[in-house]
Amino acid sequence: MGARLFTAVLPSADLVEELDHFLTPRRQAEPRLRWTRPEGWHLTTAFMASVTDDGVDRLTEALAEVAARTPAFRLRLGGGGAFPWPRETKVLWMGVREGEDQLAALAERSRNAAVRAGVRVDGARFVPHLTLARASRAIDTTRLVRVLDTIDADGWTADELVLVQSHLRDRGNRYEVLHRFNLSTDSRD
């Protein structure tokens, strides 16, 4: 079996601190959720469940080209959501208030780069989000989603794309950044 990889944009350290502080009392109030660790927060642009060593090399080259052609952009999180929906939540997430179109374009480019590299991309349509928590059994998080809707987090400049390996563990995945690709700062892109 190959490496379990994804491409992503990482939130700024300031946002991680702000959101972590906001969520602290919510974590204590909802123990039925398995809350994700702030150091693992990311906005996935493409997921690849099994990539060979050769595939990683080809993917790395293709992603470097994508990043060089993609201008850095402003991102701001806000609003809550749940998969499949708030009344039967399996995944609780924070949405994107600013930069959604640019993030979606980067996701499409990341996915296309993987396909060009001969790597199978998993997942259905792209829904920009940052996963906050998961539930073993579906629970009603309508109240939490409403609370998340009140967040108007500080924004940041998304200036890199990362290629991450996900190591599966019983007590939450461990993420290892394999490569960082700077997005273009050339305003002509």
Residue ranges and their predicted role:
Residues M1-D189:
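Histidine-dependent nucleotide/RNA phosphoesterase domain, centered on the 2H-phosphoesterase fold
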